[in-house]
């Protein structure tokens, strides 16, 4: 109610309804950079701006139903968009505030670190040059193996020289791992010997049997 008075005039009273609009509260989302972990999960923090100081202890931001995920899991130099699913809300809001949902933030995924690359069970038959082995690496995450498709480009090869093996990684590039400065581990090649057996035969002029040691199946292991 507004009352206007002046001695020269008759008192006048005017009534006016004033509508109070809810105060806008904006939410800012910040995604945290992470090291490659093979997952889409993103860590996101939220802050609310616009809540009056006198209400700050009562009206609080609730983000329990909001989750962030990267658009893809791979490492890269550029920031990636983090998609927010779910909505923020205000605890103890009696209608005095209206909440604006946050925009999708961005963050970077850096490469994980491979600490060693090695081969196990490196062996071959004594009469061949072809090696059999199992490659592995320490530092791989989320159950990934050196044999996981798309883990790297190029060819990792194991080569032998004088009974020793070395791992050649020339031209190999890992999509999500850094192995700069890591020297692949070499070692001794296990040589599988032939299994001898006795093959008997008759010699001319000798009715008895003579023996000759050869590999089983005619030099086959």
Regions found by a protein language model. Name each.
Residues 1-221:
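Short loop/turn motifs that initiate or flank beta-strands
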């Amino acid at each position: 109610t507004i009352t206007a008075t002046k001695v020269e005039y008759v008192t006048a009273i005017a009534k006016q309804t004033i509508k109070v609009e809810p105060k806008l509260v904006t939410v800012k989302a910040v995604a945290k950079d992470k090291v490659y972990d093979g997952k889409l999960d993103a860590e996101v923090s939220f802050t609310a701006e616009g809540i009056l100081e006198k209400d700050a202890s009562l009206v609080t931001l609730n983000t329990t139903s909001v989750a962030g995920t990267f658009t893809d899991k791979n490492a890269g130099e550029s920031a990636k968009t983090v998609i927010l699913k779910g909505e923020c809300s205000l605890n103890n809001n009696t209608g005095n505030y209206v909440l604006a949902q946050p925009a999708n933030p961005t963050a970077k995924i850096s490469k994980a670190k491979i600490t060693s690359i090695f081969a196990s069970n490196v062996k071959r038959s004594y009469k061949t040059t072809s090696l059999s082995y199992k490659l592995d690496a320490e530092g791989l995450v989320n159950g990934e193996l050196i044999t996981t498709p798309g883990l790297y480009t190029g060819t990792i090869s194991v080569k032998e020289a004088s009974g020793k093996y070395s791992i050649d990684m020339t031209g190999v590039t890992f999509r999500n791992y850094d192995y700069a400065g890591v020297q692949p581990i070499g070692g001794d090649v296990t040589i599988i010997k032939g299994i001898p057996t006795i093959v008997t035969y008759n010699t001319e002029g000798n009715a008895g049997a003579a023996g000759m040691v050869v590999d089983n199946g005619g030099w086959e292991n």
